[in-house]
Amino acid sequence: MFVTFICFLACLTCSYGQPRAQQYVVPSAKLEAIYPKGLRVSIPDDGFSLFAFHGKLNEEMDGLEAGHWARDITKPKEGRWTFRDRNVKLKLGDKIYFWTYVIKDGLGYRQDNGEWTVTEFVNEDGTPADTSLEPTTAPTPVRPDQPNQPIPTHRPDPPCTVSATMVDGRKSVCQGTLLFSEEFEKANLKDLANWEAEVKFPEEPDYPFNVYMVDGTLELEDGSLVLTPKLLESRFHAGILNDALDLTNRCSGQVDTTECRRQASGAQILPPVMTGKITTKNKFTFKFGRVEVRAKLPAGNWLLPEINLEPKDNVFGSRRYESGLMRVAFAKGNAVFAKKLNGGPVLADTEPFRSLLMKEKIGIDNWNRDYHNYTLIWKQDGIDMLVDGEKYGSISPGEGFYALGREHAVPHAAHWLRGSVMAPLDQYFFLSLGLRVGGVHDFADSPDKPWKNRSNKAVLNFWNDRDNWFPTWFDANLKVDYVRVYAL
């Protein structure tokens, strides 16, 4: 691959020569040594369609060779094109030799003969790291007359202040530690080791009008997870909605229940839409922390993004959100609702308590127009909600969510007395990313809605209105660029 790429660059150089290089100057690359390990290289976005980084550690490049690092980046993040090596452990005095390449307006441009020396370390967020324990000079090179011994590369671990965050399976974690990172840069869904796909008919408490499947609904594309809603008939055959569908062989729900097998009967047709959902339920669960997700929400009538924290064990009950749910980002796909962003906990299935604790931010534009950074900070004494770095709400339990639930006649609020002041949000939760359609709780009945929430023909009436809602699904994907979890 890299031989082909270098030949391509050579051709560009021959064809356009120095005059083209004078027409555009590639922005200088910013290199950062991440503490305790890692390298980040970035340039500001200037309308590029590709950014490539090629470099060597402590060894000069031989012309336009591929180097130890050779990576093509096809998508910017947060206004910058970024290459990241999370495993390399750099030392003060280390030198990186490199060249970069960009494609702008269909033409290629290089920045050659780059050199950079490690003089300091930074944290993940770019702030200076505490280097009081670092060596102040580069390791002394071995002279030819000295025994050929390896140069020490170990640096003392930084001081650790134990965090309130807890990770299932670990004794303790340090404050500010990056605990979980998914950049979705794998080639295949099977390579997502920390996630498992749902295959089932979702049921209570919201009874959405979709079935979770894998084929055609979950894809990795240009470093993002893409979840796509599709009509069930497109996967099977016309008339499938009045037939039976058995998912038992791959079902992630409870076998021998309607979560895994459905038989249509009269107005009770099969869910007409198939979508995707993945979770870390059996891979990564935690209690308290900062969750950051960069995503582009779906646009289209009756579509609902699922960027959530869900309870691992349903300690306080498995119905009606008795054990809670936390929404990192939630905006309905209908154009009339799309400027309203909501985030926070859901502790009951019905209104008014269902939405009482959710925070709202009205956007200048629809939230589904572009990618945004959504953050939920889950603490021992409350929850903070942020979007693009701006806080738009805080949720405090006060004397406990039980008191508020009892005030609103929530029948299961008494269960929370078994926990702390944050109950039911004081247990282990997992990450979930999915796409839902319709359902019986998220959309209030109105003249424009084709179904009534309490009607036994809700799914059928929704399906019969497809000529109105399906044409609005021209940008219906939920796209997730990354998911990160940090210790408090």
From Swiss-Prot:
Residues 24-127 are annotated as: Binds to laminarihexaose and laminarin. Its main location: secreted. GO terms for molecular function: (1->3)-beta-D-glucan binding; hydrolase activity, hydrolyzing O-glycosyl compounds; lipopolysaccharide binding; lipopolysaccharide immune receptor activity; lipoteichoic acid binding; pattern recognition receptor activity; polysaccharide immune receptor activity. Fat body and hemolymph. It is found in: Secreted. Residues 24-123 form the CBM39 domain. GO terms for cellular component: extracellular region. Residues 141-150 have a biased composition (Pro residues). PROSITE patterns: CBM39, GH16_2. InterPro entries: BGBP_N, BGBP_N_sf, ConA-like_dom_sf, GH16, GH16_GRP_C, Glycosyl_Hydrlase_16. The keyword Signal applies. Residues 199-488 are annotated as: Binds to laminarin, but not to curdlan, does not activate the phenoloxidase cascade, is susceptible to proteinase digestion by trypsin or chymotrypsin and does not cause aggregation of microorganisms. Glycans are attached at N373, N453. Belongs to the insect beta-1,3-glucan binding protein family. Monomer. Involved in the recognition of invading microorganisms causing their aggregation. Activates the phenoloxidase cascade. Binds specifically to beta-1,3-glucan. Binds to curdlan, a linear water-insoluble beta-1,3-glucan polysaccharide, and to laminarin, a water-soluble beta-1,3-glucan polysaccharide containing beta-1,6 branches. Also binds to lipopolysaccharide and lipoteichoic acid. This is Beta-1,3-glucan-binding protein.
